[in-house]
Amino acid sequence: MSVTQIDLDDEALADVMRIAAVHTKKEAVNLAMRDYVERFRRIEALARSRE
């Protein structure tokens, strides 16, 4: 795992933490990234299945 310093949207971060019931910013960011990748992969798979 790498250490990266980034500026985050505080409101969006708070929303993710509340919705996902996570307690740290790290958990929220990692969860959001994994969720994004999973959604993108599902969209790609659906598009391929319709070809």
UniProtKB/Swiss-Prot annotation:
Record protein name field: Putative antitoxin VapB6
Function of the protein: Antitoxin component of a possible type II toxin-antitoxin (TA) system. The cognate toxin is VapC6.
Matches recorded under Pfam families: VapB_antitoxin
Lineage of origin: Bacteria, Bacillati, Actinomycetota, Actinomycetes, Mycobacteriales
InterPro entries, A to Z: VapB_antitoxin (IPR019239)
Annotated source species: Mycobacterium tuberculosis (strain CDC 1551 / Oshkosh)
UniProt keyword terms in alphabetical order: Toxin-antitoxin system
